[in-house]
């Protein structure tokens, strides 16, 4: 069994309250460096890439460099996903750590929060990050996410401000009308700096309408490990509703070999959603064929 990526949640703390994220039901928790090391030692048998995120922001951690050092020691590549609010907490030595292959910045975090920061104050460290990447000729990818193309008037003004700022900074013409009409997946701002577009999605919940069967990438391309050590089948199960096991009690190999895990894998291969949460998840419709 191999995965393209394993999501390991260093912390479930993000410091924000974005309207597009689910209300956190689990207590605030940060995975210790020692526990993280024990998990990575097991995870490297299944993948070569770790995403340090489920719902928390890894950049809230002042000792992020320690976690990245561990990933480098185990020859893993890393993806960091952040709101962008905590970039100033870290040096470029940390942000451009040799283990980091990509940094994702969720640009929707600004307009979906009440904040004292001005738009310019929010964007400035993001643009500086891009400038430093260009200056260093660093091979890292910077992925600027704007996942609101299904929104209409409520997002238009914010998007236009972003497009204007990026147009000036990168010397590229970004026209809101054209983007909304053509709906590109990505626009290249500079070498390995991409503006990535998508739609908001509904997080799975037992309170959601019944969605039926279907395929999923969970337990196929990836699994996720929450800050508590619980293993879940996909990166959207942020509350651990489908806790396949706890790494404080069992090994990853044992957890991935249980009847429950194997039945989920078999079900998805047959386009069946075995677990109740999966039956109430609309995200899997993206993988229907």
PLM-predicted stretches and their roles:
Residues 1-103, 114-121:
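Conserved alpha-helical substructure of the radical SAM core
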Residues 225-226:
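Short, acidic, Ser/Thr-enriched surface-loop or helix-capping motifs
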């Amino acid at each position: 069994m191999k995965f393209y990526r394993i999501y390991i949640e260093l912390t479930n703390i993000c410091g924000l309250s974005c309207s597009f994220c689910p209300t956190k039901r689990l207590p605030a928790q940060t995975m210790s460096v020692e526990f993280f090391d024990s998990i990575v030692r097991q995870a490297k048998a299944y993948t070569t890439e770790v995403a340090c995120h489920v719902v928390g922001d890894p950049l809230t951690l002042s000792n992020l460099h320690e976690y990245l050092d561990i990933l480098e020691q185990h020859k893993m590549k890393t993806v960091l996903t952040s709101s962008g609010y905590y970039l100033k907490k870290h040096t470029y030595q940390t942000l451009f750590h040799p283990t980091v292959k990509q940094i994702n910045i969720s640009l929707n975090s600004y307009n979906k929060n009440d904040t004292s920061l001005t738009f310019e104050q929010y964007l400035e460290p993001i643009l500086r990050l891009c400038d430093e990447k260009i200056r260093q000729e660093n091979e890292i990818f910077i992925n600027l996410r704007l996942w609101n193309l299904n929104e209409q008037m409520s997002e238009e003004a914010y998007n236009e401000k972003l497009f204007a700022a990026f147009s000036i900074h990168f010397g590229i013409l970004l026209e809101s009308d054209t983007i909304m009409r053509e709906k590109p997946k990505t626009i290249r701002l500079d070498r390995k700096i991409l503006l990535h577009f998508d739609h908001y999605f509904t997080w799975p919940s037992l309170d959601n309408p019944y969605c039926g069967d279907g395929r999923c990438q969970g337990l196929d391309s990836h699994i996720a490990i929450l800050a508590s050590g619980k293993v879940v089948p996909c990166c959207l199960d942020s509350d651990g509703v489908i806790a396949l096991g706890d790494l404080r009690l069992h090994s990853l190999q044992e957890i991935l070999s249980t009847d429950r895990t194997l039945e989920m894998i078999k079900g998805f291969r047959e386009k069946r959603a075995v677990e109740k949460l999966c039956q109430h998840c609309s995200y899997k419709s993206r993988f229907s064929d």
